[in-house]
Every structure is written in C-alpha cells, then in structure tokens.
Design a protein with these regions (language model features):
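Sec-dependent N-terminal signal peptides of Gram-positive bacterial secreted proteins and lipoproteins
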Residues: 7-29
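Substrate-binding/active-site clefts of carbohydrate-active enzymes
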Residues: 33-45, 50-240, 255-281, 302-303
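Short, solvent-exposed loop/turn elements at domain surfaces
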Residues: 54-63, 341-342, 540-542, 553-555
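Active-site-proximal helices and loops of the catalytic beta/alpha 8
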Residues: 163, 231-332, 347-349, 357-361, ...
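Aromatic-rich carbohydrate-binding modules that target alpha-glucans
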Residues: 533-581, 589-607
Length: 613
C-alpha cells in the first residue's frame, strides 16, 4: 500500500508539473498583456483618434508606396501607427482627456474592391484575429495600452462586428476568387447575408440584413458567426486590457446580439446609431451601456455652426426621459464621418468654443475628434452633402503644439469637468431658453453641488434675468463665478417665480460656466483676432460675404458675415498671425462684387471698409 501511494503521489506531481508548464507556455504568448485600469464610465472624457492620421512612429510599416501608401492622398494610408500614438501620449494626457478611442485594430484588406481607397480607417476587416500590420505588431499595441494606462488614460477599441470588407459580389452566395476573401473562419459564405446594398434606410429589414456600402453583412443569426465574433473580440479586449468598446454600425446589428456581445466582452460598449430620432436611438440603451448621441449632435451643430434656434436643442434634451441613462450618451460636434465643425462654421473659432463648452457641460460624455484642438478645418469646403466625408475631414494631424488657444480652451474645459462631478453625473435641468440664449443647471442632488451654464449665441450682448431652479441650494446673496474667466462674477438676488434669480449681461457669442465655489483666478489666453467690418446697407433680405486670399478666405467662395446693425457687417478671423497681410473683397449674397481694387488687411487689426456696389 505504501508503494502504491508513493506511485500515486509521483503521478499527481507529474500531472501538476505538466499542467503548470502548459499554463506557463500559454501565458507566455501574452507575457506583455496589459490589464484594464477600470471600465469606461460617465466620469470620462474621450479623445477619438484615427490611428493612421495621427503620427507616424515607424516608417517601416507604412506599406507599399504608390499602392496603399500614398502620402497626401487622403483616401489612402498616411503612416500613423501605434508607435506614433505611444510617442504622443503625453500630448493627449496634457489636453486633459481620460480615454482614447482608437480606430479598429484588426488586419484590413489593403485596398477596396475598386482600388479607390485603402483600409487605413479599419472598417475593411480581412482578419479579425490579427493586428493590422500598417499600425504595428500586437506587442506594440499592448505597449501602447500599457503606456496609456500608466498615464491613467483608458483605451476604447472600435469594433466592427457588422461586416467585413467587400469580398462577395452583390448578392453573391460564393466568393469569386480563392485569393480574395476574408481570413478563416470568416471565409464561410453561410455566415453572411446576400441581399446586396441597403437602398431604403426606412426599411428596418434592409437596415439589419443588407450590406452597408458594399461591405459584406455578417449574419449574427448564424450561431457559429455569432460565437466567433464574441470570441475574437473577447480575446482582443482581454489580451490588450481594453477599457471599453465603440460598436461600429450598431444600427445595423441585431439588438439581442449587441447585448450578448457586450456581456461576452465584459466591458461597457456604446454604439453608432446614425440617425437623429431620439425614439429610435434611445432603444439601443436597453442593449448597450451607452450610445453615440446623434440626435443631439445634429441639432447642436445647427445651433452653433449655423446659428439656428436653441429650441432645437431643447426639443432633444426634453426627451432625455426616454433614455435608460442620459449620462451614458457620448456627445460630439464632429467625427470621421461628418464634416469638421470649423468647416461648417466659416472657421469661426468662437463658434467652436461655444459648441465645445456645450458638450462639456451638458449631460453625457464629451468626445473630442483628433485635430479639433489644432484648429483642423477639414479642407474648408463641406462635402457630407455628397455622402460620407472621408478625405479632408480625416487629414493628417498638422502638429502637436500645446500653446494654441483652442488646445488651451479644451484643456480648461477638461479641468472644469474633472473638478466638478455634477458635470459628469448630475441631473440636467433647463433654466432659460430662447432662440439665441440657453441656460441650464447640472446638479448633484445628493451633495448639492451645482454648475449653471449660460450661452449667448447672438452677435449682440444680451441682458437677462433668469430664475434659479426650485431644486437648487443656492441662496440669495451667494456669489457665482465664471470658470472660463473668473473676473466675471454675479450674485444670486431675490425675486422671480422661485424667489431667487440671477441677472446678467453676457457678451456676444460667449458662454458663462458658473460656480458658487471660489476658484483660482483664470482668464482665457489672449487671442489674435482680425476683424473686418463692412459698412453698407445691403437692403432687406440680402447678406454680405467676404472672399479673399489666405485661408479661411478664398477667391472661389465667400464667408458669410454677421450683421450687427443696419449697415455694419462683421467677420472675425483667428487664423492670421499679427502683421500677416491678406487681400479681401466684400460681396452681396456671394454673387455681386464690390467695386474697385481689392482691400488689404493686416492680421491682428480691425479693418473698416466702405464699399460701393
């Protein structure tokens, strides 16, 4: 019996040693694996990056020159990679964001079927399980995540479970070539729908089952496809330590699968539901942690870029009760599928500041598109009217200065949002609304912490008396300070329907973010503003435009001016340096030139002109 026991002990020891060896070998594959520093949540501020367009940290992985790698041709690979992102992490951290959303990481098809663009963006998936070699190796991706985590920056993966690249001919049920198909096991035609492209976006069957722009639509009703999608992305999330995911084309994915998918991955997800209907979008929060707030995006952009009424924003926010948690909505003013904000806003930096202030103080999680802080303008000519913009709005990052006014403005907004938790999880309550002025409160009803935002979107100063909400803890006589310029202060006074109110005169195109704290002194950095004032009564119904040399002015199309009185039109430019000279000429309705020679302007000055037409 003793001998038998000894043999048994020896056998068990050998099994344990073998098992430990196997586990050691398996874990050595991911010896550099990163781990999550915490799940994405409403406390975060997101910075969205197209990896290929950020920074080229390794020229050896750029691909074949003249094929997919074509510097300057924005439908093709430009060279950005994970090494480049890693090198610029301090720049991103210093901006004040807390999470980085990177473009899809899986290996993409080199070129589209017709060769008109490369898979630089990450949405032409070829091999879900392998990293795209243009971005780097898996170990380089893991190193990027680890370095981000060291800086307390979360990483959000962009995932693409809806489709692969366009391998199947329209409505075909088999591949036409063994050489042109996705990597196994996704090269099984039974895993796909075969209906052709979506033609009618009001037809929900088409939205869910047809192809998105020719990209092969995966059938998540197929159990094997469903299981493999969950497994491959679970591996990515686990191996690199991702903290959340953004689900591409979530509108076209079965909702039950979205819920199952998020559960399998084990991290919060937010989906792209590309439509402005709150009733439609809100349903997705029953299946995912969050969702991109396209309804608010469309209306906020109209308000801040095109000067429409604040009632359009109010009408969206009034429907917040339809969402499971409106603080989990991801808010934005532009992205890789829309024109850049400055492109639509006639390059008006102050409009940009107001739009950014809005998404940083309204409910939801703000998302800043890369390059916004560097005043990227997306070519300056709107293109989304012709479809999904995918060139100039995805330009290569122009630089990494931390001294620009917009960079510093976003930095300040990040500081404010990070300090005041009510801006992250507080209840949103409207205080005042009219066409050109909007005011709202964000209040933590447990602690009483409150921030009041007032935005004047008019071209004139506005004087208003605004009632304090009944829910507020603010008392008569309490001092409020503007966190965007602490020299601006006011007091809560008696009166109004709630017995407490604030009275203020707020300058044109200005936002106040008010706290009852006593914050450290802060004023916005000095701005170099070039102001052109055209003195002319253009008549009822007519508008004044400017054409000229030196962006944002061009000779091909005009910039619309603001009418500040019967015969005075104004246009402000912040892109010119002090002393920089340029030419310009006013036009009525952008089709009738003023008489005489071009006017000469100088950066940093106010130029008054009195044209004849």
């Amino acid at each position: 019996m003793k001998i038998k026991c000894g043999k048994m002990v020896a056998f068990m020891l050998s099994v344990i040693i073998l098992f430990v060896g196997v586990i050691t070998n398996l874990s050595s594959i991911y010896v550099n694996a990163a781990t999550s520093i915490g799940a994405l949540d409403e406390n975060d501020i997101i910075y969205m990056v197209l990896t290929d367009r950020f920074y080229d940290g390794d020229a050896t992985n750029n691909g074949t020159l003249g094929v997919e790698y074509r510097p300057g041709e924005l439908k093709y690979t430009q060279g950005g990679d994970w090494k480049g992102l890693t090198k610029k992490l301090d720049y991103i951290k210093n901006l004040g964001v807390t999470a980085i959303w990177i473009s899809p990481i899986s290996k993409n098809e080199t070129l589209s079927r017709d060769g008109s663009e490369s898979g630089y963006h990450g949405y032409f998936t070829h091999d879900y399980a392998s990293p795209d070699p243009h971005f780097g190796t898996k170990s380089e991706l893991i190193n990027f995540v680890r370095e981000a985590h060291k800086r307390n920056l979360k990483v959000i993966l962009d995932v693409v479970p809806n489709h692969t690249a366009d391998y199947l001919e329209t409505a075909a049920t088999n591949y036409s070539s063994n050489a042109y198909q996705p990597a196994a096991p996704f090269n099984n035609p039974d895993w796909y729908h075969h209906y052709g492209d979506i033609k009618d976006w009001n037809n929900e069957f088409q939205v869910l089952n047809y192809d998105l722009g020719g990209l092969d639509d995966l059938n998540t009703d197929n159990a094997d496809a469903r299981a493999e999608l969950k497994a491959v992305y679970k591996n990515w999330v686990t191996d690199i330590g991702a903290d959340g995911v953004r689900v591409d084309a979530a509108r076209s994915i079965d909702k039950d699968f979205l819920k199952e998918f998020e559960t399998a991955l084990g991290v919060p997800s937010f989906g792209e539901v590309f439509i402005g209907d709150v009733d439609y979008v809100s349903k997705f929060q029953n299946y995912e942690w969050g969702v991109l707030d396209f309804p608010l995006f469309f209306q906020a952009r109209e308000v801040f870029a095109h000067d429409s009424s604040f009632h359009n924003v109010k009408n969206i926010l009034d429907q917040d009760f339809k969402y499971k948690n409106p603080n989990h909505l991801v808010t934005f003013i532009d992205n890789h599928d829309r024109d850049r904000f400055l492109c639509l806003a006639d390059d008006n930096y102050q409009k940009l500041r107001l739009a950014l202030t809005f998404i940083f103080t309204v409910r939801g999680i703000p998302d800043v598109y890369y390059g916004t802080e560097q005043e990227c303008f997306g070519g300056g000519v709107p293109t989304e009217w012709a479809g999904i913009p995918n060139k100039e709005n995805r330009e290569m990052m122009p630089g990494f200065s931390e001294n620009g006014n917009i960079y510093k403005y976003i930095q300040r907004l990040n500081q404010i949002r990070s300090k005041y938790s009510c801006l992250r999880n507080g209840t949103q309550r409207e205080m005042w609304v009219e066409d050109k002025l909007y005011s709202y409160s964000r209040r933590n009803d447990l602690t009483g912490q409150e921030i009041i935002t007032v935005i004047n979107n008019d071209t004139q100063p506005l004087t208003r008396t605004i009632p304090i909400r009944t829910e507020s803890s603010l008392s008569i006589g309490q001092k409020l300070t503007n966190l965007l310029n602490t020299k601006d202060t006011l007091n809560v006074i008696s009166g109004g329907i709630t017995g407490r109110q604030i009275s203020l005169t707020i300058p044109a195109k200005t936002a106040y973010v008010l706290t009852s704290d006593t914050p450290a002194a802060y004023s916005e950095p000095n701005r170099v503003v070039t102001t052109i004032r055209v003195h002319y009564d253009s008549g009822l119904g007519n508008n004044m435009y400017l054409r000229g040399s030196g962006y944002p002015l061009t000779w091909s199309s005009g910039r619309k001016m603001f009418n500040i009185s019967n015969d005075v039109w104004i246009y402000e430019i912040e892109r010119y340096d002090v002393g920089e000279q340029f030419e310009f000429k006013p036009m009525i309705n952008d089709n009738t030139w003023s008489q005489g020679n071009n006017y000469i302007g100088t950066g940093g000055q106010t130029i008054d002109v009195y044209p004849n037409f």
